[in-house]
Amino acid sequence: MSGEMDKPLISRRLVDSDGSLAEVPKEAPKVGILGSGDFARSLATRLVGSGFSVVVGSRNPKRTAGLFPSLAQVTFQEEAVSSPEVIFVAVFREHYSSLCSLADQLAGKILVDVSNPTEKEHLQHRQSNAEYLASLFPACTVVKAFNVISAWALQAGPRDGNRQVLICSDQPEAKRTISEMARAMGFTPLDMGSLASAREVEAIPLRLLPSWKVPTLLALGLFVCFYTYNFIRDVLQPYIRKDENKFYKMPLSVVNTTLPCVAYVLLSLVYLPGVLAAALQLRRGTKYQRFPDWLDHWLQHRKQIGLLSFFFAMLHALYSFCLPLRRSHRYDLVNLAVKQVLANKSRLWVEEEVWRMEIYLSLGVLALGMLSLLAVTSLPSIANSLNWKEFSFVQSTLGFVALILSTMHTLTYGWTRAFEENHYKFYLPPTFTLTLLLPCVIILAKGLFLLPCLSRRLTKIRRGWEKDGAVKFMLPGDHTQGEKTSHV
């Protein structure tokens, strides 16, 4: 009975990368860490929690001992590197030379470089940090790993941070050892090849949303253009022509007029490249020729453009809710009531305007709901739970429905304003007429592609048929047309 009571309540088991429990070896290898910064402390915490024996080497162990877990041994650097076979080098590149005095003790051991250069250092040095470390310690095996994992992710665990650990080294056995450690810590190792790949791996943390740069600049450019256009029509024109001060509209009213224009055009730009790609395939008669680079990049940025469209649409909805809260709106209501009294009208009701408002608000809510569905299904956790047909239906079919609803929302908002002369201020057409051009072209093109003569040809091309091919090809059930040829 006493023997049972001496057993620990929690066994030395770890959560593996797939969520299952993985056994740690009974005699876990001793791991050394050189450095006492934030990353070194987080790494030590994670290693201790995973059942490893951790020795931390510091220049001043008495000062830094209280910052590390109690189970981690904090000592001088010479003692920390004496027994472990795997040593994490958690110091900056400029401090590598201070470790040269340990070269004899480090010989034959695995050095794991976890550092990242600054943008200036990355451009200045041709060698990666890991390659530079390997040149200083030729008798050691250098592995680049854990540099894309943040200190917070190490402390919080892989469930709340990035799970992938990118690993590169010239020695397969060393990569295997570090991969096993990463799995024991609950992460997913990913082999990136030899140590020559370390420069590319070190560049990853330096990137700031690379796939969002062009879509964001596009959205900002559209916002500036539409805001300037609306400012000229709604603020500048009344000031010049009628001497009316409408500058109070700039912070909210003009912004709210601009937001739906940007959202609508961005949504159109999500589906325009698909139309261009289909037209190009029909013209070429094959799918095996590459698209132009500009079209290829455009197709790859559709997700980001769509999410920005949803963002601007949500802002438009929030701004619209704020419109009745403005002091200027309250003054307009009072002035309208005074005019009604002076005109001796007991009831003001315009049936056409009432119906128009009800319809276009309803269509706007439906369009925003569709965009919300598209945004949710673009999340990796949701997208991974859908098969390709389900994902394609939501993003392609329902997305096109959202474009149609947005077009109907815009048309009912504009109503007959496009044909009324007083709405052409400075001879500039209403803003909504400009936004309608591109979506209407896309909807018309999509409708043309649904015609049997184009639809069947496009389907054949995407199944491998070629206009000037050499292999007989016929779609299932296509008995009425002659045989075609293909290189399938």
From Swiss-Prot:
One GO term of the biological process aspect: exosomal secretion
Segments in the Vesicular topological domain: 229-258, 326-358, 412-433
Enzyme class at the top of the EC tree: oxidoreductase
Residues carrying Phosphoserine: 11, 17, 20, 486
Ranges in coiled-coil conformation: none
Domain named Ferric oxidoreductase: residues: 259-407
Cofactor annotation: FAD; heme b
Residues engaged in binding heme b: 316, 409
Site (Cleavage): 325-326
Protein known as: Metalloreductase STEAP3
PANTHER family named among the record's database cross-references: DUDULIN-RELATED, METALLOREDUCTASE STEAP3
Highest taxon, organism lineage: Eukaryota
Result of altering residue 316 to L: Loss of ferric-chelate reductase activity
Subcellular location(s) per record: Endosome membrane
Family: Belongs to the STEAP family.
Deletion phenotype: Mice display iron deficiency anemia, due to a defect in iron release through the transferrin cycle.
Function: Integral membrane protein that functions as a NADPH-dependent ferric-chelate reductase, using NADPH from one side of the membrane to reduce a Fe(3+) chelate that is bound on the other side of the membrane. Mediates sequential transmembrane electron transfer from NADPH to FAD and onto heme, and finally to the Fe(3+) chelate. Can also reduce Cu(2+) to Cu(1+). Mediates efficient transferrin-dependent iron uptake in erythroid cells. May play a role downstream of p53/TP53 to interface apoptosis and cell cycle progression.
Glycosylation sites: 256
Oligomer status and interactors: Homodimer. Interacts with BNIP3L, MYT1, RHBDL4/RHBDD1 and TCTP.
GO cellular component: endosome; endosome membrane; multivesicular body; plasma membrane
Phenotype for residue 409 to L: Loss of ferric-chelate reductase activity
Disease implicated: Defects in Steap3 are the cause of fragile-red phenotype characterized by hypochromic microcytic anemia.
